């Protein structure tokens, strides 16, 4: 039979029904877009709370899913055997924990960043659609069991998964070229999720249970590399936001950023 048992394969994914699996990413990407459309870009500049609630759901989704993957990985019964499997196992868990940490820190830092011009658009529309597809695929389409790590979708779910993986790049290119596509990133990813949910509801598919083929491993590695790239950029934005905030509050003068001992002492 070409399916993993629940103990072998689904322990590294959320134990929810397909509908509930698809609901969090749909809400997490639709809510920031809705906030942006309701309030407009000018309301974000001096409103940290509005920035906070805009990014809370997508970044919380990212943090929760990565922490869940780490939790299930550490609590599974079949630990890795061999040096290579152990190295890949601990490296993968370290990366997932790093992604979760960056997401949590971004929730704290982004609201204090100064959003000017189109920053509110990029943070509410582009940013969620940029990192959420890889999180979604790691949670629903990848096996993280040592020795079986790889992409597990079969049938029509394979092109759907590939479309989800590529939609951040496609959306970003279209948005940069034509302004009429400015809402496409908030539409394309949810549409693909809905297509997948409808397909799973009507025609449930099995997961690959054969030894992991090279192309499946390659897709998983690509998803992981894409995640590393995305969260590296997010970490950079976090550092810049933190530096700018400290420059305005602690290291501030009228001419240039300098050390303010009185403000440092007030923080102790």
Curated annotation (Swiss-Prot):
Q: What is the similarity comment for this entry?
A: Belongs to the UPF0328 family.
Could you identify this protein by its name? UPF0328 protein ECU05_1640/ECU11_0090
